[in-house]
């Protein structure tokens, strides 16, 4: 067991007085989420010894990493992916998005429930189930989790060639991903599906974590607020993203609302080639505009699935153009 004892008796007594009792499980996470319990840093350090230098005692007497340190967050993710998902090699460029894995896993599990709701409450599994990850990034988080949990096959797209190069290395170094994750570059920064979705390709679902902000300035302001909440009161003029992120990952013209609205518009051309289109929606205020866009394109069915990670509430919107009869035919052909 790892030990991080205070230096003297006074510190030990002070630490015990300040020790905060945390719940054993994180509230709100999906019941199948492997991260419902608090991080077991002893076990994670056994799986990934590189994590050990980033561990330190907190003011409350437990052990954690500095979530304002991008290297610490990256190493925590590396340890989680190795310990829970069997990923032997995982590395991303310093300026790439390093997302919190528990929340990403929740999206995958709730998406599995969405598919199950159309299949007699049975989750369709295996390589016959094909998903399209828009903005896969260097981290490949959704394909890693989806393949490990449900055996799904993924196509991941991105506009960033450097991110895709890093993603290709992750795929090549992990046998479980070699035949289950295909990567494509989106060469048109204004397109989402066009150019990466062949005419004859069919997907059981799409998923996406869209750029959140409408400008680089807005993204930087959000970073400063996050660092302040983490106790970093002296914030640099150009702060480092604690979870990383290049411009294309963090912001785009029109922000989240503009990006997802364009996705809705493009989905019409692929209406019969996909069962469920989905996208995360971080801002609740974005929903009315997305619902309006979906009414305009005459989506047959729209669902909003809420997720909670502690006090944070997020959701994804799902839509389909398939009628109930077409849905039944799809299930019989692909999921039986």
UniProtKB/Swiss-Prot annotation:
Q: Which GO terms describe its cellular component?
A: cytoplasm
What is the catalytic activity of this protein? adenosine(1618) in 23S rRNA + S-adenosyl-L-methionine = N(6)-methyladenosine(1618) in 23S rRNA + S-adenosyl-L-homocysteine + H(+)
**Per its record, what are the GO molecular function terms?**
23S rRNA (adenine(1618)-N(6))-methyltransferase activity
- Enzyme class, top EC level, equals transferase
**Documented EC number(s):** 2.1.1.181
UniProt-listed GO biological process terms: rRNA base methylation
What does this gene product do?
A: Specifically methylates the adenine in position 1618 of 23S rRNA.
Q: Which PANTHER family match?
A: RNA N6-ADENOSINE-METHYLTRANSFERASE METTL16, SAM-DEPENDENT METHYLTRANSFERASE
Q: What is this protein called?
A: Ribosomal RNA large subunit methyltransferase F
Native species: Yersinia pestis
């Amino acid at each position: 067991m790892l030990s991080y004892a205070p230096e003297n008796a006074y510190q030990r007594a002070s630490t015990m007085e300040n020790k905060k009792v945390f719940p054993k499980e994180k509230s709100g996470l999906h019941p199948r989420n492997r991260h419902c319990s608090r991080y077991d840093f002893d076990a994670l350090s056994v799986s990934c010894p590189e994590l050990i230098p980033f561990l330190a005692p907190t003011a409350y007497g437990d052990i954690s990493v500095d979530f304002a340190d991008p290297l610490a967050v990256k190493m925590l993710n590396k340890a989680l992916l190795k310990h829970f998902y069997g990923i032997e090699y995982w590395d991303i460029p310093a300026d790439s998005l390093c997302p919190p894995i528990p929340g990403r896993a929740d999206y995958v599990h709730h998406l599995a429930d969405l598919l199950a709701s159309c299949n007699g409450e049975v989750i369709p599994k295996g390589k016959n189930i094909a998903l399209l990850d828009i903005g896969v990034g260097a981290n490949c988080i959704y394909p890693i989790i989806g393949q490990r949990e449900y055996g799904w096959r993924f196509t991941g797209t991105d506009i960033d060639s450097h991110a895709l190069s890093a993603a290709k290395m992750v795929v090549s170094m992990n046998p479980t991903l070699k035949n289950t994750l295909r990567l494509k570059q989106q060469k048109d920064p204004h397109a989402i599906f066009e150019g990466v979705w062949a005419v004859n390709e069919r997907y059981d679902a799409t998923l996406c974590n869209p750029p959140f902000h409408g400008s680089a300035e807005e993204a930087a302001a959000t970073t400063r607020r996050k660092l302040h909440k983490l106790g970093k009161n002296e914030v640099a003029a150009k702060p480092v993203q604690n979870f990383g992120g290049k411009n294309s990952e963090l912001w785009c013209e029109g922000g989240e609302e503009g990006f997802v609205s364009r996705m809705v518009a493009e989905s019409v051309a692929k209406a019969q080639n996909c069962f469920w289109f989905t996208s995360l929606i971080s801002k609740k205020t974005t929903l009315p505009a997305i619902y309006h866009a979906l009414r305009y394109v005459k989506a047959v069915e729209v669902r909003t699935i809420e997720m909670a990670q502690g006090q944070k509430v997020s959701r994804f919107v799902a839509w389909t153009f398939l009628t109930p009869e077409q849905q039944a035919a799809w299930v019989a052909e692909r999921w039986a």
